[in-house]
Amino acid sequence: MMKGQHRTYRKISLPTLLVVLLMPFAWSADAQQQFISEGKIEYERKTNQHAFLDENNMWDEMAKKDLPKFVTYYQDLYFKGNRTLYRVGREPDQVQRKSWSVLDPDEVIASNLDSGSAISQKSFFMDTYLISDSIRRIDWKISPEIRKIAGFDCRKATGKVLDSIVVIAFYTDEIVTSGGPESFAGLPGMILGIAIPRMHTTWYATKLELVPVKESELTAPKKGKKYKGPEFRHDLHDLLKNWGDEAQKMVWQLEL
């Protein structure tokens, strides 16, 4: 510096200084955030079967004394990229004693999220059906509420299915596959929790396994009487239209 010249210093505000100092930590946090596109998720499906029973029916009231309040099953979701397969998981710890209106969750659902298509295998009345359909589109409303599920921070979303049934979902964007249990999909990440108050049923992930997923674990089922989705729903409603409220509950379960 030449004699007579003065160095000028730019004043830095405290907020600016804090931003500069914290930037390396922000980069580090971003680098550590994981984005998962392959693995296996276990869901616990729990139904309040006492709520399924008719309180005005003498036989149903008697059944409540003999049946446990909740029926619990486990189901697995294999996912890789934009393909998923949902199927029966491990056996519950105890034999599940249940009402006839609570169906066994023995379906297999293979979904291709890119094409928006799904193939489902469902059993009902000793018959097996193979149903080709499009993935249900739900007008999800996302809210700020966060819930921790299976170690992930999950954001809440609500929507409706089957015209009027409210669905509450919790999803994480750390798992980039936009699928979920049953045939639920369409959120910006994996759905780890579902609650359907009208069906008195919840699905919550219990764990994620970061394992390679084989092609055979994503292969769509092939056995069963072949149906298109609208055709299956029409025949199902026609079959059960005279069965009353109990039949409606079974229809909801089969159409998920």
Listing of model-derived features with the role each one plays in the protein:
Residues 32-256:
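Extended soluble regions of mature proteins
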Residues 1-36, 254-256:
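Bacterial Sec-dependent N-terminal signal peptides
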